[in-house]
């Protein structure tokens, strides 16, 4: 995050737009929230929340039995590291916002879709065409979204949907942190930017923070992702669910996760 912000500051942006998923699956979530809150006090920022924030808010309101281990260890680590103040701040964010900035036409920002933080937008489906046509319902020609961790610029006529990618966990085969800059001169001009950062320093923090020990194969998969841009955790989940169904075992069984790690060659 700090590498991206340093790069973006050199471009002197008028407004900072944050699309959610600030926490979970990375070390030191409380530290991250503190940083963002302080940053927001000193910059012109708009924050919305993503599905990861929703997980933590739901856990406070309706606790589940998250245990350390590959299935839910990373979630428990995150929840235990956050304070009530952190959760209050995150809960105060909307899941979408129609933004009006002087000198620009309005636009939408969301994490998944304007209605669902966990909506997964695919650019090669009929839904993509339908979502683009729905921009008229919001009175905008531009929507910013996230969730997939895969950057894209989807254009149909004068309608645009832009996903800037991911700062911390890109899964498009790249290892740089990703964000977008959007200029307006009567038309929208988006640019997706990649920024190198110290991957091995970040990988070391998984162990230093305790996240790796508490999340087992999941944490190892996350480190593999930041090193390769491959979504190892999703691949592991698919294998574990298949093995669990075949063998009549719970998906929390660590032997299944270890088998998935071996199949995927997760170190």
Region locations from a protein language model:
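Core catalytic region of metal-dependent phosphoesterases/phosphodiesterases
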Residues: 1-84
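Glycine-rich phosphate-binding loop signature in dinucleotide/nucleotide-binding domains
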Residues: 8-12, 42, 101-103, 136-139
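Active-site neighborhood of phospho(di)ester-bond hydrolases with catalytic His/Asp-centered motifs
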Residues: 16-21, 46-51, 110, 142-149, ...
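Active-site environment of divalent metal-dependent phosphoester hydrolases
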Residues: 24-27, 52-57, 115, 142-155, ...
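Active-site-proximal segments of metal-dependent phosphoesterases and phosphodiesterases across multiple
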Residues: 65-69, 105-137
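Metallo-beta-lactamase
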Residues: 70-106
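Anionic-ligand binding region
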Residues: 128-167, 177
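Acidic, His/Gly-rich catalytic cores of divalent-metal-dependent hydrolytic chemistry
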Residues: 155-164, 168-267
């Amino acid at each position: 995050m700090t590498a991206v912000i340093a790069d973006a500051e050199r471009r002197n942006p008028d407004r900072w737009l944050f699309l959610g998923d600030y926490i979970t699956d990375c070390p030191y979530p409380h530290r991250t929230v503190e940083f963002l809150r302080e940053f927001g006090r000193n910059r012109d920022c708009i924050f919305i929340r993503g599905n990861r924030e929703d997980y933590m808010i739901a856990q406070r309101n309706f606790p589940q039995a998250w245990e350390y281990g590959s299935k839910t260890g990373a979630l428990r680590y995150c929840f235990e590291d956050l304070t009530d103040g952190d959760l209050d701040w995150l809960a105060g964010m909307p899941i979408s916002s129609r933004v009006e900035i002087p000198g620009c036409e309005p636009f939408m920002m969301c994490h998944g879709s304007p209605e669902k933080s966990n909506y997964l937008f695919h650019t090669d489906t009929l839904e993509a065409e339908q979502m683009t046509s729905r921009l008229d319902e919001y009175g905008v020609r531009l929507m910013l979204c996230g969730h997939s961790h895969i950057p894209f610029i989807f254009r149909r006529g004068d309608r645009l949907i832009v996903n800037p990618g991911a700062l911390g966990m890109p899964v498009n085969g790249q290892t740089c942190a990703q964000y977008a800059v959007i200029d307006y001169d009567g038309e929208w001009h988006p640019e997706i930017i990649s920024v190198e950062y110290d991957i091995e320093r970040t990988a070391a923090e998984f162990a230093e923070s305790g996240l790796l020990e508490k999340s087992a194969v999941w944490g190892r998969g996350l480190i593999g992702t930041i090193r390769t841009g491959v979504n190892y955790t999703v691949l592991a989940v698919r294998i574990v669910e298949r093995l669990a169904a075949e063998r009549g075992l719970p998906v929390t069984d660590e032997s299944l996760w270890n088998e998935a790690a071996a199949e995927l060659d997760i170190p």
